[in-house]
């Protein structure tokens, strides 16, 4: 997402009751987008950065006013730096060993990534051994029709990517996708 479209796209998501917006650091000018969103939404929405893979990024996103750091991997150094900077910290994990290491490092929640490679039965097995206070969020390949299975397995939420927004999408397309995810969440709540 670019700074030119970030406010309009994000407003469409907020209108659909999305309360957390993550700007991937591999986007064009991500720090500028984060600063714009923080200024625009103030405390109404949690603004964060995704694809956080180094210590320099932690400093940059904290200075930009982000409140959330999401990583594709589990790095003890990055988790500790993010926590020291006051950020909500969600590292990526794929195994129980990685999950326990990130919990010990101070992670606030865990990103099960890539979820395409970890079907709901894997999440259920992980939830059986991990502390119940730690939320697990499947990310990667999540679509509205997959939400119910993951929620039944114990998902505490989801990270949404290209099924919600891809470069070049219009605001209306993103709003339609947001509606589809909201419907998927309602269906999964009824199925529980």
Task: List the predicted regions and their residue ranges.
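Conserved N-terminal beta1-alpha1 strand-loop-helix module at the mouth
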Residues: 1-67, 74, 84, 144-145, ...
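Small side chains
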Residues: 10, 157-159
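Conserved acetyl-CoA-binding loop of GNAT-fold acetyltransferases
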Residues: 18, 107, 154-157
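Conserved anion-binding
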Residues: 29, 44, 56, 62-149, ...
